[in-house]
């Protein structure tokens, strides 16, 4: 196995739109594959075109404008969406996916690239026609819209739900990022995935950064689905007991949240916005305690990143978080606002408890959720597929 192709609509790159979890994962994954000597091809579409070569990395993002070029199809797709006619909307969404797959075929032929395997994400159903390339492919369950809708209440159109279902039921190889993820995909699509847990980079050296006493860090997008309202409520209670307490937001959307909820600026809140790389690690290492009150996750990557830095965490009572945290050993699971308040207050007041929880959290990630293990297990899975094709 020499060449791995990643078929994606999201990738963390300075010349691409801001990336979420999928794009960040593939950036980190690609870097690790290149370090191991593999050739990596990134192909997909997004709102910004990108074409380039850097050593063993080939990137080609086409501009996503299929429906702008086919406005009659867009008219019928929109009609199907508005009238909730799933088959009509899905029919034209499939045409877009088919067009992208055909462009991938043309790209591979033109550049004489022969991937040994293709990896792609589960959302938007973009794997639907990959079987036509006669190249083994793997779908990694980053969290498709149908799953997010069913379990966490996210919005999804009927047509998109239909093509995601069709694509996943058709996929010969599915990677799930946790036991909880595996269960959700099996219940929804009748397909049992292979568990390869996500992980974080544990090889970095700590960046010197003093801990801010009585600081609560919220690491993620400031929105209701991430439980930001809970974080604010808990913080306001903590501030009455600990007047010097501060809430630190590392992620997007804080100003938008304030506008949408008609809230004024809150005292003792520090908003860093979106951070990445060493700057992110430097800021996160200032935390005394992390709060993760999300209402739904297929995996807790941000949670793992905080624990990997040797920080105490208090997280929502979600199956995906319970997969990672052993309650009261390497973190805390909170079932309501009272418990968030009690656990964070205890971590503020008892330095020995905070230290013990933090040290055990770091060991948990190093042993079980190390990104190097994610890469190693993924490559072994690829090879197994290739050997049996």
What name fits each language-model region?
Residues 180, 199:
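Carbohydrate-associated surface elements
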């Amino acid at each position: 196995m020499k060449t791995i192709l990643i078929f994606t609509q999201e990738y963390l790159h300075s010349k691409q739109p801001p990336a979420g979890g999928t794009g960040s994962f593939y950036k980190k994954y690609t870097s690790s594959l290149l370090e191991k000597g593999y050739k990596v091809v990134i192909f997909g579409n997004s709102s910004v075109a990108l074409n380039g070569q850097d050593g063993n990395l080939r990137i080609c993002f086409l501009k996503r404008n299929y429906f702008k070029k086919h406005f009659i199809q867009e008219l019928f797709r929109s009609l199907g969406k508005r009238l909730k006619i799933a088959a009509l909307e899905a029919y034209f969404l499939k045409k877009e996916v088919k067009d992208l797959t055909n462009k991938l075929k043309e790209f591979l032929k033109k550049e004489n690239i022969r991937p040994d395997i293709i990896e792609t994400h589960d959302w938007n159903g973009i794997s639907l026609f990959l079987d036509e390339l006669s190249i083994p492919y793997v779908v990694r369950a980053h969290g498709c819209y149908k799953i997010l809708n069913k379990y966490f209440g996210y919005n999804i159109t009927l047509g998109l739900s239909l093509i995601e279902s069709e694509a996943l039921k058709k996929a010969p190889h599915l990677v799930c990022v946790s036991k909880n993820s595996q269960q959700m995909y099996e219940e929804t699509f009748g397909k049992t995935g292979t568990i390869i847990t996500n992980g974080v980079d544990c090889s970095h050296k700590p960046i010197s950064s003093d801990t801010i006493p009585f600081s609560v860090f919220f690491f993620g997008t400031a929105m209701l689905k991430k439980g930001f309202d809970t974080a604010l409520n808990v913080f306001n209670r903590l501030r009455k007991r600990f007047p010097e307490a501060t809430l630190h937001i590392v992620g997007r959307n804080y100003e938008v949240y304030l506008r949408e909820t008609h809230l004024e600026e809150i005292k003792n809140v520090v908003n860093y916005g979106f951070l990445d790389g060493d700057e992110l690690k430097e800021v996160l290492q200032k935390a005394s305690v992390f709060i993760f009150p999300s209402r739904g996750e297929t995996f807790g990557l941000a949670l793992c990143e905080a624990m990997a830095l040797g920080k105490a965490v208090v997280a929502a009572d979600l199956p995906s978080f319970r997969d990672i945290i052993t309650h009261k050993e390497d973190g805390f699971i909170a079932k309501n606002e009272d418990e968030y308040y009690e656990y964070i207050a205890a971590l503020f007041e008892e330095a020995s408890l905070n230290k013990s929880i933090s040290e055990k959290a770091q060991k948990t990630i190093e042993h079980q959720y190390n990104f190097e293990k994610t890469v190693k297990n993924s490559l072994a899975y690829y090879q197994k597929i290739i050997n049996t094709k």
